[in-house]
């Protein structure tokens, strides 16, 4: 199935694109999406994605359809869902 991922900040700068699509098997988890992103954009490894665990490095996280933030990478996105790869930013 095809999942669209929109990038903001560093992910957008490293990838050179605003968004991309990745192909994953039905029933795939966000971790599978992360692995697909790492394969497509090796520059994500290190700063954005831990190359050993395929966890997103803090402060990065996924938002689903601009409505929901999954608590773990075991969330199974559905066909056609749009993932936003965001980062937590604090200021004063």
Question: Whereabouts are the PLM-identified features?
Answer:
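Ubiquitin-like/PB1-type beta-grasp interaction modules and other compact soluble beta-rich domains
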Residues: 1-91
């Amino acid at each position: 199935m095809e999942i669209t991922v929109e990038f903001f900040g560093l992910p957008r700068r490293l990838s050179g694109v605003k968004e991309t699509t990745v192909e994953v098997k039905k029933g795939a988890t966000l971790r599978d999406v992360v692995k697909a992103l790492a394969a497509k954009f090796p520059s994500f490894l290190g700063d954005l994605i831990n190359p050993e665990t395929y966890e997103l490095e803090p402060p990065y996280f996924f938002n689903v359809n601009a409505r929901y933030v999954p608590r773990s990478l075991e969330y199974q996105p559905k066909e056609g869902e749009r993932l936003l790869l965001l980062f937590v930013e604090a200021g004063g």
